[in-house]
């Protein structure tokens, strides 16, 4: 479904990713681990069309995405939940969610928005309690739920999730990760998860990639093949 092949990418003249190749199949979950500064966020931003690509290719559902802007990639069914959540604080929870449905046609909105909203609040009941509240007054965990819910309103087939546990209380991390598990089981949604918490990656994902200094140092082994020693060794390779 998603194929990243020999990607070199970064920001302007600053190259961050070097010859990165990875694959995500329909309904699969893959994780990307690595130390701070390894290029994990840049990888997701590159797939979403938000970085400069110097070489290589990104294919989604058999279509090349080279040169395609981010909004066009989103319209194909590729959703990005960025690090830091990026919700609109002055808008209500409901308004934030409705913005997430922008790629639907007018007929689809009329027919499906109510059902989509129901599915999001079923997944995150706390959002139903805060439906009319401004997003800026939500807790960090509630804002993360809102960011994921907003992405789901576009009916994606692939969702890229960047550091969902960042800055959250343990009970909120458990709720957010539980929701990602539900999405896999109930929606057959393909997920690419960037996360510092190794156990969350191993619990959710079928395969794991490890980045260090912008290069893959461990490429897509199944989670049961990864040992803690192997993960630690990969983190400290020079790349």
Task: Kindly give the residue locations of the regions a language model identified.
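Conserved ABC transporter NBD signature motif
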Residues: 56-64, 76, 112-117, 218
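ABC ATPase C-loop
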Residues: 151-152
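The feature captures the beta-strand-to-loop junction immediately N-terminal to the Walker
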Residues: 33-35
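Helix-to-loop junction immediately C-terminal to a conserved catalytic motif
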Residues: 48
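ABC-type ATPase nucleotide-binding domains, specifically the catalytic core motifs of the NBD
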Residues: 12, 68, 93-112, 123-125, ...
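Helical segment within the ABC ATPase nucleotide-binding domain
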Residues: 174-187
């Amino acid at each position: 479904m998603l194929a990243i092949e020999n990607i070199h990418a970064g920001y302007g003249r600053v190259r961050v990713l070097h010859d990165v190749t990875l694959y995500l199949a329909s309904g699969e979950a893959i994780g990307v681990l690595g130390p701070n500064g390894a290029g994990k966020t840049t990888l997701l931003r590159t797939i979403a069309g938000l970085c400069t690509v110097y070489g290589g290719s990104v294919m989604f559902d058999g279509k090349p995405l080279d040169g395609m802007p981010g909004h066009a990639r989103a319209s194909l069914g590729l959703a990005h939940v960025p690090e830091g959540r990026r919700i609109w604080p002055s808008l209500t929870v409901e308004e934030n969610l409705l913005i997430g449905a922008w790629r639907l046609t007018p007929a689809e909105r009329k027919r499906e928005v109510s059902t989509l909203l129901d599915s999001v609040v079923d997944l995150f009941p706390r959002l139903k309690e805060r439906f009319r509240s401004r997003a800026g007054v939500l807790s960090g965990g509630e804002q993360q739920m809102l960011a994921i819910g907003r992405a789901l309103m576009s009916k994606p087939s692939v969702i890229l999730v960047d550091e969902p546990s960042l800055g959250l209380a343990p009970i909120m991390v458990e709720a957010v990760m539980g929701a990602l598990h539900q999405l896999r089981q109930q929606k057959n949604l393909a997920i690419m998860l960037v996360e510092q918490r190794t156990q969350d990656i191993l619990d959710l994902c079928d395969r794991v990639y490890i980045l260090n200094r912008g290069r893959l140092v461990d490429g897509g082994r199944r989670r049961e093949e990864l040992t803690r020693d192997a993960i630690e060794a990969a983190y400290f390779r020079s790349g």
